[in-house]
Regions:
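Pyridoxal 5′-phosphate
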Residues: 1-217
Length: 217
């Protein structure tokens, strides 16, 4: 259908990889400020010229009449600064994050021989690590990591309220028990190798404990 619109959710990728909307023939693209160390509650919607877009909120002429209401000026300015810094430092940040990512992947594989790295080892965002651990629940894993001060996820923010295993992991062939025990760690160029060691150390204690409790392990 030639009238189909192509929308890209670039929240995770913006600032981590080059995104060229015109060259990629993207119609609409979403970006969020907090993913690039900007303020929370601010984002950007890129809309290709000529794409019809209906008003979200009627009233004033703010945002070219698309969404009435006073703009979040501090958030907009903060996002602009964060975006500028992200673009200027992208290459250096990619290098640092890739080194941390590969180090963390290596440490997890060394300490958890029955774990599985989800996705390609190299063809992935420089700051993304996603593993599955058999016969444990992702929710329990996240709660226990949180108690140790480690922020993690078992899937996308879109499915954060669901206890079901990731439909994406199931679609790429993971067994139910592996998809249910998935863990996503998103890194920053501000992280350190020492923090990666802390994650692995705490993860080892938690995974061993949860697997020992599992009747299936």
């Amino acid at each position: 259908n030639p009238n189909t619109l192509f929308h890209v959710d670039a929240v995770q990728g913006y600032g981590k990889a080059k995104i060229l909307p015109k060259r990629m023939k993207i119609d609409m693209l979403s970006v969020s400020g907090h993913k690039i160390h900007g303020p929370k509650g601010i984002g950007v919607l890129y809309v290709r010229k000529g794409v019809p877009l209906f008003n979200l909120i009627e009233g004033g002429a703010q945002e070219r009449g698309r969404r009435a209401g006073t703009e979040n000026v501090p958030g907009i300015v903060g996002f602009g600064v964060a975006a500028d810094l992200s673009m200027k430092n992208m290459e250096a940040n990619q290098k640092k994050e890739t080194e941390l990512r590969d180090y963390l992947i290596g440490q997890i594989e060394a300490n958890f021989p029955n774990s599985k790295l989800n996705g390609s080892r190299s063809n992935r965002l420089p700051n993304n690590v996603n593993f599955s651990f058999p016969f444990i629940e992702g929710e329990s894993l996240l709660i226990m990591l949180d108690m140790k001060g480690i922020c993690a996820s078992s899937g996308s923010a879109c499915t954060s309220g669901s206890l079901d295993p990731s439909h994406v992991l199931l679609a790429i062939g993971l067994r139910h028990e592996m998809a249910h025990g998935s863990l996503r760690l998103t890194l920053s160029h501000e992280n350190t190798k020492e923090e990666m060691d802390t994650v692995v150390r705490e993860l080892k204690v938690i995974v061993d404990r949860l697997q020992a409790m599992s009747p299936l392990y």
